[in-house]
């Protein structure tokens, strides 16, 4: 199946101009012309599989021998429920003024953000049981599993300007309008620009299928954020100048002798725009979002160092191995690392008491299970946006404030690579991940204003986005069914009245706000409804999210032929070694940090909860040594 894949222009998303004072409506979306414009007539590429290969393909193809495209990159997201569009095919609800959904008008996405997600007292409520790494790991996993890129079609720069400056709705521009009393009206005009997500090429005559969005990534936990799901980029990310199986590293700067990611040569660079004096470019990584935030770039840096450490050690054990073998074996181990940390350490403290209900013990690969990431999962996993605190801390070797600016506002660190390269490296940031706490999601304190008003606003020269409004608008863009449809899907009650909804949410104020906005629980956008629910015992999501996340992760695991526990993927001795891996060991092996917590996802206090790196098990690679002739 061929898809339209248009990666967002990062600089365009940064340099927002003042919106014009009038709003005009463009033509209704025309799938025929859009499809012809991007060349949907071209034949789909033919994939040839090697059924005996011990390694995943970069693209995710060939995992399932019977259906090689299952879980592959650049395929449609799966629909667990049919799409719901205003016209039944492609127009999102809220597109046509005055048109209702289930008899009620939809509230503006920004109004929902202001009244439900925002809060006046900006002081965070921190999670007393989860470290900041807990939040960060969720983002790492999300960026390994899904990316539905924007599509910016039409008259190139003119089309984007119409969306950015004039709030012109049409084809792929679906601007987020501001309510009349919104404080952003004074500084940003009438709207925030919003480009609709890329879609799968429809089948002629373009009238039979609803619009389906793309997942540009593989659906497998395979560390594709390190290696890329795109063959040409995967090759660029490697150091092919020597047969050592290494990833390319930065040749211009280092972190006190340790590697940084290479710079991206793409110009203009939003990271250079942030600080025109420092002029530090964005990094090149397996995922295009690696430089969006400094903690994400820090995580990518750890993983590229670990790949090269693994490849180097494997070469020592197996001098006869060539570069391709070393690369693939290190990649295979790092993929297992992501799987193990996610299922052993992360998901149990996300799903809490619902873990065993939705993700039972592993029974082996099942080729009848479809691992494809579902459309709704791309919204369910956004619960992590509510765990992001308003500030980022940098800590010294004694886990005390580092340097003259140890505490930085979150919004100043978007596309901010210079803070890492020229102001301390990654160690102070990693210590902050280990010793500081995530934000706790509270029904009356959902998302920090740093994300709700200042997303991608690292300097005052740039207007900030609203992540909550974007998430809500994206639900409609993707044709997502409403809250109660998903409650029914998960065999949960479907509240219809204020009393019934309050019995689910257990919060009268929030319940009334939601019904005042939406009119009926049936219309509540899935992301909003899901994050509004009280948390399950010992978890960090409500019952609906536990269902959607649990179902997806079970399918990711059971439908993956290369899952680390599947017999034949690793030897028994190799699996015994892999069971000892830990994020703390990753830190010990790839930074100059010497004190780490044993359980890095829990909230930890220094020094009582920290141990020397010598107390943390190392990954024993001796089972990977080939038998000597």
Where do the language-model regions lie?
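Alpha-helical bundle segments that constitute or directly flank the non-heme di-iron/ferroxidase center
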Residues: 293-305
């Amino acid at each position: 199946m061929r898809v339209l894949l248009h990666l967002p222009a990062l600089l365009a998303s940064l340099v927002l101009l003042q919106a014009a004072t009038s709003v005009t409506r463009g033509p209704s979306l025309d799938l025929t012309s859009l499809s012809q414009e991007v060349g949907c007539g071209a034949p789909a590429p033919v994939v040839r599989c090697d059924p005996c290969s011990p390694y995943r393909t970069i693209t995710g193809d060939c995992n399932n021998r019977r259906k090689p495209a299952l879980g592959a990159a650049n395929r449609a997201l799966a629909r667990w429920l049919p799409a719901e569009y205003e016209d039944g095919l492609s127009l999102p609800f809220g597109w046509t003024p005055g048109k209702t959904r289930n008899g009620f008008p939809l509230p503006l996405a920004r109004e929902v953000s202001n009244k439900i997600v925002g809060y006046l007292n900006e002081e965070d409520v921190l999670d007393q049981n989860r470290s900041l790494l807990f939040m960060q790991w969720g983002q790492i996993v999300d960026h390994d599993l899904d990316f539905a890129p924007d599509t910016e079609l039409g008259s190139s720069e003119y089309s984007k300007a119409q969306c950015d400056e004039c709030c012109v709705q049409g084809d792929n521009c679906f601007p987020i309008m501001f309510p009349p009393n919104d404080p952003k009206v004074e500084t940003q005009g009438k709207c925030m620009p919003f480009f609709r997500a890329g879609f799968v090429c429809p089948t002629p005559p373009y009238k039979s299928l609803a619009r389906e969005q793309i997942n540009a990534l593989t659906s497998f936990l395979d560390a594709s954020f390190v290696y890329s799901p795109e063959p040409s980029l995967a090759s660029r990310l490697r150091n092919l100048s020597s047969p050592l199986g290494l990833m390319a590293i930065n040749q211009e700067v280092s972190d006190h002798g340790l590697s940084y990611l290479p710079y991206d040569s793409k110009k203009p660079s939003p990271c250079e725009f942030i600080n025109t004096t420092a002029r530090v470019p964005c990094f090149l990584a397996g995922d295009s979002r690696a430089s969006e935030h400094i903690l994400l770039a820090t995580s990518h840096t750890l993983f590229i160092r670990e790949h090269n450490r693994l490849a180097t050690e494997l070469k020592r054990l197996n001098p006869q191995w060539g570069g391709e073998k070393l690369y693939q074996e290190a990649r295979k181990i790092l993929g297992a690392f992501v799987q193990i940390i996610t299922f052993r350490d992360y998901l149990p403290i996300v799903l809490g008491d619902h873990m065993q209900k939705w993700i039972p013990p592993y029974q082996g690969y099942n080729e009848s299970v479809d691992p494809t990431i579902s459309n709704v999962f791309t919204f369910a996993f956004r619960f992590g946006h509510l765990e992001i605190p308003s500030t980022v801390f940098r800590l010294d070797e004694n886990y005390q404030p580092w340097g003259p600016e140890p505490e930085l506002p979150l919004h100043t660190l978007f596309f901010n690579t210079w803070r890492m390269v020229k102001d301390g490296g990654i160690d102070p940031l990693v210590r902050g991940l280990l010793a500081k706490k995530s934000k706790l999601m509270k029904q009356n304190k959902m998302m920090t204003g740093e994300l709700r008003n200042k997303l991608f606003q690292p300097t005052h020269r740039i207007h900030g986005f609203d992540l909550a409004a974007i998430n809500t608008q994206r639900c409609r863009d993707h044709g997502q069914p409403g809250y109660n449809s998903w409650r029914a899907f998960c065999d949960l009650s479907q509240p219809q009245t204020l009393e019934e909804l309050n019995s689910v949410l257990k919060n009268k104020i929030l319940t009334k706000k939601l019904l005042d906005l939406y009119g009926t629980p049936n219309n509540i956008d899935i992301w909003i409804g899901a994050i509004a629910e009280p948390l399950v015992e010992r978890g960090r999501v409500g019952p609906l999210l536990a269902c959607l996340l649990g179902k997806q992760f079970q399918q990711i695991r059971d439908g993956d032929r290369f899952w680390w526990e599947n017999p034949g993927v690793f030897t028994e001795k190799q699996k015994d070694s892999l069971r000892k891996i830990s994020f703390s060991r990753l830190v010990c092996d790839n930074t100059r940090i010497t004190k780490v917590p044993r359980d890095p996802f829990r909230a930890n206090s220094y020094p009582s909860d920290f141990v020397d790196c010598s107390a943390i098990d190392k990954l024993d690679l001796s089972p990977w040594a080939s038998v000597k002739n």
